[in-house]
Amino acid sequence: EKKDARVLVAISADDELVGGIVYFGDMAEYGSGGIATTVKNASGIRLLGVSARARGTGTGKALARACIQLARDKGHSHVVLHTTHAMQVAWSLYEKLGFERSKDLDFVQEGLQVFGFRLWLGET
């Protein structure tokens, strides 16, 4: 169990788990490589997943937006996340939500390039 971490889930009308995401209100608990765990005044999101059945329904967007709102509620100035080239659908979603590439957050893990993104929240 991590301090100020939450697992948010999406449940369909017929009570099926169709998506989930992990929100971190304390970047020290974010658990990634690179400098992300040292970032101040930020929330993090990880491990967005949506079932094949629910893809294209806005489930992933709703889960990410819920995390963004949690970050706003904490008064954080930005939200941090990581993804890889293999996650092109998620990458596109993050960009549509306003996340921008943040090369200072990039790192390599076991030979895999991991790309950092940041969403600046502005006035909360």
Regions found by a protein language model. Name each.
Residues G44-R46, R55-K61, T83, V114-L119:
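Low-complexity, flexible helical/coil segments
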Residues T57, D73-S77:
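Short coil/turn segments at alpha/beta junctions that flank glycine-rich nucleotide-binding fingerprints
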Residues L8, S77-V80, T84-T124:
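C-terminal "cap" of GNAT-fold acetyltransferases
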Residues M27, A52-A54, W91, K103:
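Activation segment
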